[in-house]
């Protein structure tokens, strides 16, 4: 059972922003079993094809991302959610400036230890 001593109360303005490349920034809040990441993508940003053991749920707050999954293109716009199962290869393009709130279960170890080189490319 969780106690108040275990709870985290965080203002987004206090979350460190990391610049991954000229078109993508990221902010993360991590719990014991889940990760919440706000990803800010400028129009034209590309998240290369990748997969991971984590289940991913991107919730687009503003803008639009075009995902390529299983040979299909899916456009997810502000106010929409996409559920991406574990180990499913996917990539995405920002069709406009976009704010994406990603939920991962479990937390992305490659993001935490900064071995996510597929995102740290220069364009």
Residues covered by each model-derived region:
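Ligand-binding loop in jelly-roll beta-barrel domains
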Residues: 86-110
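Short acidic-glycine-tyrosine-enriched beta hairpin
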Residues: 71-86
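Short, conserved beta-strand element in jelly-roll/cupin
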Residues: 41-42, 52-67
């Amino acid at each position: 059972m969780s106690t108040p001593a275990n709870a985290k109360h965080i203002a987004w303005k206090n979350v460190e922003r990391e610049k991954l490349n000229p078109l993508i920034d990221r902010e993360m809040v991590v719990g014991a079993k889940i990760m919440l990441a706000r990803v800010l993508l400028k129009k034209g940003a590309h998240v290369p094809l990748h997969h991971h053991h984590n289940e991913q749920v991107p919730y687009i707050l503003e803008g639009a991302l075009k995902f390529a999954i299983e040979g299909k293109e899916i456009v997810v716009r502000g106010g929409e959610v996409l559920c991406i199962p574990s180990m499913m290869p996917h990539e995405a393009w920002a069709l406009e400036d976009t704010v994406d709130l990603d939920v991962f279960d479990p937390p992305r170890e490659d993001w935490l230890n900064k071995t996510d080189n597929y995102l740290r490319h220069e364009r």
